[in-house]
Amino acid sequence: MTIEEARTLIRGVEWRGSRPGLSRVRELLHRIGDPQDTLQFVHIAGTNGKGSTAAMLAAVLQAAGYTTGLFTSPFLEQFAERMQVNGQPIPDAELAAACETLQPCIAAMDDQPTEFELVTAAAMLWFQRRGCDIVVLEVGLGGRLDATNVIGAPACAVITNIGLDHTEILGDTLAQIAREKAGILKPGTRAVSYPQTAEVRAVLHETCARLGIPLTEVDADAIEPLRDSVDGQTFSYRGAVYDLPLLGRHQLRNAAVALETVAALRTRGWRIPDAAVHAGLAQVRWPARFEVLRRAPWFVLDGGHNPQCAQTVADNLARYFPGRRITLLVGVLADKDYPDLIAQLDPYAAAYIAATPLSPRALPAEELGAYLQRFGKPVTVCPDPAQAAASALAQAGEDDVICAVGSLYMAGAIRTYLRREHDENSGH
């Protein structure tokens, strides 16, 4: 099978959309020999911070010498990013080989899998073929009925920051959403949690008590920021000092989740030296999370798509770029709470550019532009995200800041454009 045929297979199931439930992915994996049963996992659910926390843990485990798989979604620039081993995305030939194994199994199924289920199965097969010692596995949506929850008890189950998102599927209270996320907790694992609201903590404590598993919660008071600039942060947690290239105070809490997860893994026999923890955190890369892509003018990229993320971006703009003129390049999905997202960011905006993310669920730039008019600031409508980035750069002064925000489905196109522009200008 060629990579084009593999992509056609994946696209062919894409139109079926998202259908919660484990029966299809369970059947598909069983038909290929249940590769997930031969692997060890750190399973991560939550509303925000899943990807950043997963990237930190994968970097630490790799630095400790383990062959480390990483499964995340969605991708930014290329599909292969969704499954990586030791920081390297799956090669085309190996993705094609995994899909070739899956194809006859899919054809034999009465109830055919969704795109996410197919990709989850392909990843499990590839991680097994690559001999992964451990896989950091990010939930796609929710937890209880997510395809990744087909695994048995993981070495550690991690719950990152829980907020209101996907309410039409997961429920419209924090407690309901927390119950869905807590569906990844199983007897025989250990649980680690971000510092949550009282409502969420109550659900996690009740679930862990019922399952008879230990729960470690990050102690937010034990996090001490020591240095903070656009070049990265230094902080201490429980007295030990760490460097972190990711920006924003929330990333210190995500890092503390990673540190508590390392401690939990150590109790289960995983050998993770302190030096590997320091090296992993210092080297971690996780694009499109308040990522500074260029300076003079500054261009910051954030894929955040809900009000919680917007508050984080607003805090970071105030912290890193006080007093500067900021243009917000915004693109959103129509089913997201974009009025609240924009309301959080508007105090920092001198002007807006409206773009259309690369998704069938996108709100058209024209509609977004019309909505933005109410804030009484200049609004430019430029549907193509790359052209919107070019337009923003053309209008910006040396000291100005452009902040692209609202959707990971827009962030990838902008990141690709800026990388190519940088390569052309530097003669690469």
Region spans (language model):
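Active-site-proximal loop/hinge segments that shape catalytic or ion-binding/gating pockets
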Residues: S407
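ATP-dependent carboxylate-amine ligase catalytic core
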Residues: S18, L22, R26-D37, A63-G152, ...
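N-terminal leader/targeting and accessory segments in enzymes
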Residues: M1-N48, S52-T67, L76-Q78, R190-S193, ...
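Nucleotide phosphate-binding/pyrophosphate-handling subdomain across enzymes
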Residues: T38, I134-L137, L145-V158, I162-G163, ...
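Short, high-confidence coil segments that cap the C-terminus of an alpha-helix
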Residues: G131-D133, G323, G397-D399
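Acidic, Mg2+-coordinating active-site environments of NTP-dependent enzymes
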Residues: D111, L118, G131-E138, P154-R238, ...
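C-terminal helical cap/extension that packs against the catalytic core
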Residues: Y194-T216, V230-D231, W298-F299, P307, ...
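Beta-strand->loop->alpha-helix junctions that form or flank phosphate-binding loops
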Residues: Y194-P195, T207-S229, P245-R249, V277-Q283, ...
